[in-house]
Amino acid sequence: GYVNGLESAEETLAENRESGDFGSSAAAMGNVTHNGCGHYLHTLFWENMDPNGGGEPEGELLDRIEEDFGSYEGWKGEFEAAASAAGGWALLVYDPVAKQLRNVPVDKHDQGALWGSHPILALDVWEHSYYYDYGPARGDFIDA
């Protein structure tokens, strides 16, 4: 899995630093970003899927969504568009440079993110997430 891949890549980098042989470092760094982001995004996704979760946001998050997207419906429509366009993930992130929330479609775990952004919500739209229950109807999964 992603955790084992991340740990293995980190071990390779540590060994390379110790030996001074960096021939496999580029591949290991790629494995750090791929496996690290895969692990972090799946962790966030499962935290978001809490059985007691769901419904519309409240409090500070709702206030910020309304400020940055105009309304909850505006955010939701844009998030669903990101999920429909993405090959892998749709993310709601906080962009500290622009100081606002953004919806981001991401095709691979480590591509498409804004540097320095903090993911708040993740929707896994890889086929393994929905195909068993929804078949090719990804839109139905997104709507659920």
From Swiss-Prot:
Respond yes or no to whether keyword Lipid metabolism is given for this record: no
The record's comment on cofactor binding reads: Binds 1 Mn(2+) ion per subunit.
Q: Which SUPFAM superfamilies match?
A: Fe,Mn superoxide dismutase (SOD), C-terminal domain, Fe,Mn superoxide dismutase (SOD), N-terminal domain
- Start and end residues of each stretch annotated as Disordered: 1-22
Asked whether the UniProt record includes Membrane among its keywords, one would answer no
- Reactions performed catalytically: 2 superoxide + 2 H(+) = H2O2 + O2
Give the protein's recorded name: Superoxide dismutase [Mn]
The species this protein was found in: Haloarcula hispanica
Q: Which gene encodes it?
A: sod
